[in-house]
Amino acid sequence: MFQNNPLLAQLKQQIEANKEYVEGKVKASDKNFGFLEADKKSYFIPPLEMKKVMHGDNVKAVIKREGDKESVEIDSLIDPMLDRFIARVRFNKDGKLQLAVDHPQIRLNIPATTHKKVTEQLANDDWVVAQLKSHPLRDDRFFFAQVTEFICKADDHFAPWWVTLARHQQPRESVKTEQSYTLQDQSPREDLSHLYFTTIDSPSTQDMDDALFIEPITENAIQQGWRLVVAIADPTAYIAEDSNIEHAARQRCFTNYLPGFNIPMLPRELSDDLCSLVPNKKRPALVVYIETDLNGNLIKDASFHTAWVESKAKLAYDNVSDYLEGVEQAWQPDCAELKQQIYWLHQFTQARIQWRSKNALLFKEQMDYNFELNADGSVKSIQIQYHRIANQIIEEAMIIANICCAQFLAKHAKTGIFNSHAGFDPKNYEAVQTFLLNTLATDENRSELTDLFSPTQLATLDGYCAMRRYIEDFPEKFLELRLRRYLTFAEFKAEVAPHFGLGISHYATWTSPIRKYGDIVNHRLIKQVLLNQPIKHIESTILARLQEARRQNRLVERDIADWLYARYLLPIATQGVEFDCEITDISRGGIRAKVLENGAQIFIPCSTLHENKDEIDFIPEEIALYTKGEKIYQIGQATRVKLTDVRLETRSVLGNIIK
């Protein structure tokens, strides 16, 4: 009697019309309830409704009200949190396979089967890749998954590496080697093997792709400037453009440098041997001649050539730095030619640093942290690596070589893989101006700074550089750290565009073709120009893949480091150890602080910062916390933190700020 009843249909429409829907993301709690985080509001999800969803699901829900209390009833799934995911194997008491998702907020064990291609015998706590096959809101059944890939056994000491690489879908093996390698590029090359080229790198480096030779330019026995010859390894001499190696490099895009080892972009026979500029071996290279005056100004167009070169010495950063800095009992050059090359390179570097300080932008000094590992992958120690004068020698040589490459490609090829950075995101111009004026302006200089920091000025390379130079000597770190949040991301482009971060109008890397696929592409373009061949324009898919691969590699580096820090600090987690730290981030949930002596990130929950959590106000514009109108913590602030807990399963390190 109710079938096709118009009154019933009308009633259903009225009920539906009266429903109040909301969309948002599910946030799980430590209990069996959760919250739906919608725009500027949070709704309670009762335990029964939470069984339909998991943390991170994007859902549509109906708002329910009982008195002054609001909750939601889940209606439908918009996007699931999980698709492909990392998990640990769990077998329940009946021996049924379940998967514990490797995510700090997802605590349910998902029933699963194993794909037939997975042949390993699974055991508790093994690491696997899985695919979510069913979702209660999408498939009218319970959560269910399938193991699609075995990662490693539970007791594998290198699990942090293998799991992280699998999470970000990065290869863990080198590119498959060929039976033999022959020189594909048979075009004539200059023989520069008589020049005293040297490399400066870390002692353990095998994939050396740059070597330097320098000499003064003189006129009537008076020095007028410098002639720098930069020789770059030429893997394109061995790699055909349509080869399997080329396709693999195009997918990988970069050599992955991980704690303890690297995963090369090219087969190791090429990256560490045939193409590497090892001492006393003749190697094919792409070479640029660069001429500057004594102040570091380029005085003529750079000249590119294919050549044969032979490195005469492999030098180490610390040895060269110790020598130049006059450290007692430091390493010494073993011949007059080497001593002369180091001296001249040092003089050239000083001139280029001065040039960049006036005409471009210099990098802010930052410490790097290196993990020293035991054979089993455990962390033996963490060393601070400082940016010393030998590092600057290579840095300045590579920067000027990359500037010359960009100018050459822009002029002759009209395309290339250019490194660009547009400075601040345009939507942030006014916020940047307001922030800088609030921080720096006085009654006397407000008018001047309003013009200096205006959106029209910040949008130009010259205006951005002027702003950077003005704030260079500001003593507090929060200014620099806050400005970083307003920046846009660096991009790869097929047409020349300025790099605001460097303060340079033309920039294209070609100096690391063993390690970067974009540099291989630029090598091929340079050769096409030199040989008067047709220029191949850059495919947008290459730029997109470079961008994505760079992002993936950074995530891999971060995730492995987080895991190793957790392992390293776990044995002392309950010993009340205190560290000098710098606040690197602040949110409503708490503070993140970097340990200065080892680089670890410690999270300090907001609940530990003040006796009354409700009195704490987070001001996102300042990245600061206030209580009763008084600023108590700000990004960049120095503080002391006591280590309180390390949770290895979530790779999280917790602490309390010492008042």
Curated annotation (Swiss-Prot):
Where in or outside the cell it occurs: the entry states:
Cytoplasm
S1 motif domain: which residues? 576-658
Catalytically driven reaction(s) = Exonucleolytic cleavage in the 3'- to 5'-direction to yield nucleoside 5'-phosphates
GO CC, alphabetical: cytosol
Instruction: State the EC number(s).
Output: 3.1.13.1
Please list the GO terms describing molecular function. exoribonuclease II activity; RNA binding
Please provide the record's keywords in A-Z order.
Cytoplasm, Exonuclease, Hydrolase, Nuclease, RNA-binding
Source superkingdom: Bacteria
An annotated GO BP: mRNA catabolic process
What is the role of the protein in this entry? Answer: Involved in mRNA degradation. Hydrolyzes single-stranded polyribonucleotides processively in the 3' to 5' direction.
Q: Which family does it belong to?
A: Belongs to the RNR ribonuclease family. RNase II subfamily.
Quote the HAMAP family the UniProt record gives.
RNase_II
Which NCBIfam families does the UniProt entry name for this protein?
A: 3_prime_RNase, PRK05054.1, RNase_B
Please identify the protein, giving its name as recorded: Exoribonuclease 2
Q: Which organism is it from?
A: Haemophilus ducreyi (strain 35000HP / ATCC 700724)
Gene coding for it:
rnb
